[in-house]
């Protein structure tokens, strides 16, 4: 039986992530739960971005907008004494769907630089709106008064929150894979390659891309909701352009057009970031070149690098068998 690195490594990573709470409890280091909880949450957001960026070719420089919206839904509702998780989830999905539909209808009529700038403009508009909400902390942010509660299950428990986020991540990877392999995904990928030809074949590509954009926004909103419960705090910085840039880096670093890629990318990026922070306060000077080198070494990302290693391993195996 031949070893498939592109399957084995992601599965091993998921298995490792599933065991993090057990290890954190065993060594009495809750910090690991917080660190990897952040990795899982950002992996969800990166997976959502990969749907439109990796498969649809839509470079959104404002995707963190939906991360911030999901977080602010939790923060504002809990501020008013509402801790019902089902209400938090429903409002998050509704708000992100409406904002995603509105911004998508306007931005998807353009391509290239124009699309990038429009998505960035919308994100910055909501960023400054959040800064102006003095009742909810303004630029200083807002502490989350109460964690989301689903019946008797409260996300105030770090282990419960971690496993909920991990389950959402696994669901997103599985559902995303099914979605892009279906007719819907074929149209999205075809539109990325040649939108005019797809329209000539009778496919309403704008409608398909809008649906993908809205789905992506809603999933990212769920990540924001989980992030607010993780940090017990919401801030306009969650939807800043720098946060959107980080999501793009995670997707590109992990590998475009592969739902396991963003999981690898978010894990690698946040672990490297955390490691460098412990070495020097000027960690960004080292971090930037490291990311650039990583992308240059493997233009298809870490997931693509696994494929390259698989090919080399197969060639070496055949060479050894030929000599034998």
Where does each model-flagged region fall?
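Transmembrane alpha-helices and adjacent helix-loop boundaries
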Residues: 1-324
